């Protein structure tokens, strides 16, 4: 009876140990899977960093597409590659694709396909760049046109302002010139009047002097005649002697 009870008491312990071993095995399997995943990712990153090769999953998809196309068309020129054996595992796109395993026709087709896709992508990028350049050029032309129009509007406003100021100044100068011309005309008229008055005065003075000289001459003649009349005879002219 005591032996049975001891065997029952050891049973849960064995169960715990067995569960622990199973958990350890599961952890080991998970660690191995993690290591494999990390190694696969590392290989994938190293293969994707090469600039001269295409992406592995793209090459694999291109190869499968070509294989299906060959199977459908059954072209006699390029025989399709042999199908993989049934025991092969499914293709993992994360593993780098080895081009050296393909035959020459498939390699040639694959190269043409890659060149075709690269050329199409290049043409697409060139078209996008040309469209962007055209859009940028149109936008630049629009901005320049608006800037030039604004500058021309400012220049036109300044020209109008300067023209208005010039017209005002010309009017002022014309008015000043007319005023000075009138003043000069008045001065000329006054000078002419003064000159005529002076000429008239000069003529009057000359007439007065001539009249005075005539009167003086007449008076002298009268005096001489009176002297002659008193004496009755003519006598010698009186001589005047100056000095001793």
From Swiss-Prot:
Residues 77-89 have a biased composition (Pro residues). It comes from the Eukaryota. One of its GO terms (cellular component) is nucleoplasm. Residues 1-104, 213-244 are annotated as: Disordered. Disulfide bonds: none annotated. Residues 1-11, 32-46 have a biased composition (Basic residues). Residues 224-234 have a biased composition (Polar residues). Residues 12-31, 63-75, 213-223 have a biased composition (Basic and acidic residues). This is Uncharacterized protein F44E2.3.
């Amino acid at each position: 009876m005591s032996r049975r009870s001891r065997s029952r008491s050891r049973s849960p312990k064995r169960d715990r140990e067995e569960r622990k071993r199973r958990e350890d095995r599961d952890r080991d399997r998970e660690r191995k899977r993690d290591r494999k995943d990390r190694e696969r990712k590392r290989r994938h990153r190293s293969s994707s960093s090469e600039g001269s090769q295409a992406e592995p999953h793209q090459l694999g998809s291109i190869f499968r597409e070509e294989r299906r196309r060959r199977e459908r068309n059954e072209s006699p020129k390029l025989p399709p590659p042999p199908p993989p054996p049934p025991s092969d595992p499914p293709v993992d796109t994360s593993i780098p694709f080895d081009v050296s395993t393909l035959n020459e026709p498939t390699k040639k087709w694959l190269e043409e396909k890659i060149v075709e896709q690269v050329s199409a992508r290049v043409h697409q990028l060139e078209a996008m760049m040309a469209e962007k350049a055209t859009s940028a050029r149109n936008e630049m032309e629009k901005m320049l046109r608006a800037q030039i129009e604004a500058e021309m509007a400012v220049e036109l406003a300044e020209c109008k302002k300067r023209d208005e100021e010039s017209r005002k100044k010309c009017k002022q100068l014309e008015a000043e010139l007319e005023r000075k011309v009138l003043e000069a005309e008045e001065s000329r008229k006054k000078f002419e009047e003064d000159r005529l008055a002076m000429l008239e005065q000069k003529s009057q003075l000359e007439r007065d002097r001539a009249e005075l000289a005539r009167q003086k001459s007449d008076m002298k003649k009268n005096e001489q005649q009176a002297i002659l009349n008193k004496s009755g005879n003519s006598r010698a002219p009186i001589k005047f002697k100056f000095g001793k």
